[in-house]
Amino acid sequence: MKRISVDIGGTFTDCFFVWDDRYVEAKALTTHHNLALGFNEALDLACKRADLDRVTVLSEVDSVRYATTLGTNALIEHKGPKVGAIVTHGFEDAIPLSRGRGYGEGLDYSMQQNLPAAERPDPIVPRAMIRSVKERINSAGKVVARLDPDDVRSVVRELVNAGAEALVVSLVNATENPEHELAIQEIFLDEFPPHELGAIPLLLGHQVSGRKGEYVRATSTIIDGFLHETMFHALSQLSQNLRDFGYDKPMLVIHNSGGMAQMNSTDALQTIHSGPIAGVGAAEHLSSETGVGHVISTDMGGTSFDIGLVPEGGVKHYDFLPTIDRWLVSVPMVHLDTLGAGGGSIASYDRIHNSIKIGP
């Protein structure tokens, strides 16, 4: 058995590979401008320890598995493109209002007990970047009000002219009938063809999440759109780098559900927490091998600290409506708690509020 596993975090890139009966690990600094460079450095160090070379390893290895917290860190630090959202007319404020729970979502229990002192998180999509189109599909999937193509063109142009670098579409009841979301996509591609310079991605809510619930589907699509380019470029760099050195198999990406898939079968949203969740899977295996009943899995990087549980020798806790950072989404994942503080966090004194702040 020959496998390579790589975990790229905000600070370090860790490489671990199994080569028949040998187990080798190595670490290098993450190179954010080109993630492949840090990966190559870690892999070369591991190869040196095993008396192998990179080309031999990549041409003979059975699989390369990739996990990361890059998406998690980008969301926590709000590093991403300017996103515009298109929703059904009359639902423009559904996202900012966040079902009336935005003040408490993602906070611990003690902080939720004092909601008057809580603050809403900074929006990924500000209200000024939300536009609506006149259309309506009922809960049975029947078209009640037809979509106006001219209205769509006007809205799309407004968002692009306002500086949108990614667009998301989340219409009411689109999971029952995606006709209008698909029509918006067709109009958008006609207005802004993907082969032209400056082309921007457009994501559809019913494709990102096929579950009911307008708000959680919208937030899921927004986060996916916010992270799409970041994760696409990161994964593409790594995939091309592997091919350049003789790896001719698909690169596998760890999902936050605990499974894995090829890059072209992975949404950006599915990569959030994939690094520490892969660690939870390893803790489950360790529990099984050693007979230890309960295991706590922790993953402290330079940017975040993640905690997972393996009670009674198995992963039993899944979130079907998890909160990622401060946002409720509808993508099922292994339960994990994340703190926005790690080995590289900086403490500072806020003179105005007379408080200590720690974080990225």
What is each stretch, according to the model?
Residues M1-P360:
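N-terminally biased helix-coil "hinge/interface" segments that flank
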